[in-house]
Amino acid sequence: MRKVAKRIKDIRKDIDFNELYALKDAVSMVKERAVAKFDETIEISMNLGVDPRHADQMVRGVAHLPNGTGRNVRVAVFARGEKAEEAKASGADIVGAEDLFESINSGTIDFDRCIATPDMMLLVGRLGKILGPRNLMPNPKVGTVTLDVANAVKASKGGAVEFRVEKAGIVHAGIGKASFGVEKIVENIKAFASAVIKARPQGAKGEYIKRVAVSSTMGIGIKVDPATVCSE
């Protein structure tokens, strides 16, 4: 317990929790404090000025991170015939139709992203109660219901990150690893923020991005000046 207490004290040292730090400074501070024995994920959390209980204030989309996430993303694809072969050739980890349906329906979910061709959605739709809560349900709005399965698989493995606002008006995502350089993390965060801004719903009034924080898996959140996140 003493070691844990000391670690927490060290992490909190020299941080002003009332300060809004410039993005680059915040990322540097988070990286310096990511001292776990594994490569911690760097995460961003954004509080938005929306109430997702209203349909016209839902925020959902996909961000394409220029430097990837640092994760080995496992991709499952629902497809048949030629499209199934395209998915396999593009690096999909799991490809199937009824067999994949049965596997998921029995509780086997060993993938991070799910893609489907449009003709498969009648089958995939029956898995809504399983895939929906896990944010794995294919959706044309984020490019996971498509005939272009090859590019969808490549995008998923190359840094595509889905986001969806939660009840409290928060969107969050892992946008890299502590082993990434500061500039790469900053570039990824700006790409994520840009996608969130583009996804601003018509029903959103007033200030859209209210608060931003950056953290690592085992670290604490550091407040970021939203203006430095949204600037070019």
Curated annotation (Swiss-Prot):
MF terms in GO: rRNA binding; structural constituent of ribosome; tRNA binding
GO biological process, one term: translation
Cellular component terms (Gene Ontology): cytosolic large ribosomal subunit
Keywords, sorted A to Z: Repressor, Ribonucleoprotein, Ribosomal protein, RNA-binding, rRNA-binding, Translation regulation, tRNA-binding
Claim: Repressor is one of the keywords in the record: yes
Classification via NCBIfam families: rplA_bact
Subunit structure of this chain's protein: Part of the 50S ribosomal subunit.
Family per similarity comment: Belongs to the universal ribosomal protein uL1 family.
HAMAP family (alphabetical): Ribosomal_uL1_B
Free-text function comment from the UniProt entry: Binds directly to 23S rRNA. The L1 stalk is quite mobile in the ribosome, and is involved in E site tRNA release.
Protein's recorded name: Large ribosomal subunit protein uL1
Species assigned in the record: Bartonella quintana (strain Toulouse) (Rochalimaea quintana)
